[in-house]
A protein has these predicted regions:
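N-terminal hydrophobic/helix-forming segments and targeting peptides
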Residues: 1-279
């Protein structure tokens, strides 16, 4: 692994344990980590309830702990062991229930029996736990204690932005997501590679184009950002790329624009044809 690759990997290792979501302290902690490496990053907050076109910024969610205690006293689905165990945006709960009721709040993947699924419920208040199908099959009848120490409150959605000026005002737009918890490909691959790209762009001595780069929560973060910057974006952006799920061992790929012949499309095809692009 080269020096840049090692740095990218080290950043991912540091960021992996953080519990990120659409909002909350995990996103702030992630952006602060990035800012420590890239001081030019500006962190912005959009208050809960803010109208963004026909969407509304949701309440802020934070989770401190969560687990299930089985009939034998064993603690399972422990949030502190793996933050994927808690359904994202779960409402708080602390009660004893029977297995039959518990099952209604459990999520697993039969076709991937060792995997813990990633489940969220951003806009429908509920609580739930995620576990591997192998662990699910071990559950037996009896009384279980379920506890999720979470909080939903009016707060804000957080995103980071950096602008790198070039000789002209026309911009290349890059975005990447910072809202998934402990997942490497879908999502951390995007932010850490984007960090490396920023460092590379900063070293270019004669940049023709300017660059606008954002670290945002998926969907609502994009909508919130565009709603606040639409005039500048329409005026200056000539190409844009969303950098996500680029950490697996499959071929590089891109999703074409609706038109198929924009500058973004042409650049992507030109670059990918020299790597592993197949028409």
């Amino acid at each position: 692994m080269n020096i840049v690759g090692q740095k990218i990997y080290d950043w991912a290792v540091d960021l992996f344990p953080i519990n990120r979501s659409l909002s909350g302290n995990g996103v702030r902690q992630t952006l602060q980590y990035i800012k420590n490496i890239i001081p030019e990053l500006e962190v912005n907050e959009v208050p809960s309830g803010t109208k963004c076109f026909d969407w509304t910024v949701p309440q802020e969610w934070n989770c401190g702990d969560g687990y299930i205690v089985d009939p034998d006293g064993n603690k399972i689905c422990n949030f502190k062991a793996n933050n994927l165990h808690i359904v994202g945006y779960s409402i708080p709960v602390d009660k004893e229930i029977e297995l039959e009721e518990l099952i209604e709040h459990l999520y697993y993947l039969e076709d991937q029996p060792t995997a813990i699924p990633y489940i969220t419920s951003y806009y429908s208040p509920r609580w739930g736990f995620c576990l591997s199908f192998n662990e699910f099959q071990k559950l037996k009848k009896g009384t279980y204690r379920v506890k999720i120490d979470s909080e939903l409150k009016d707060g804000s959605l957080t995103y980071g932005e950096i602008k790198l000026k070039g000789r002209i005002e026309k911009e290349i737009f890059l975005s990447t997501y910072v809202c998934h918890p402990s997942m490497a490909n879908n999502e951390l691959s995007g932010p850490v590679v984007t960090m490396a790209l920023i460092n590379f762009i900063k070293l270019l001595k004669d940049r023709k184009h300017s660059y606008r780069i954002v670290f945002i929560p998926e969907t609502i973060g994009s909508i919130a950002y565009i709603s606040r910057n639409i005039d500048d974006m329409k005026k200056n952006i000539i190409a844009g790329f969303n950098i996500t799920t680029i950490g697996d061992d499959r071929n590089y790929s891109y999703i074409p624009t609706r038109y198929g012949n924009t500058l973004s499309d042409k650049v992507s095809k030109h670059v990918l044809q020299d790597i592993d692009y197949v028409e």
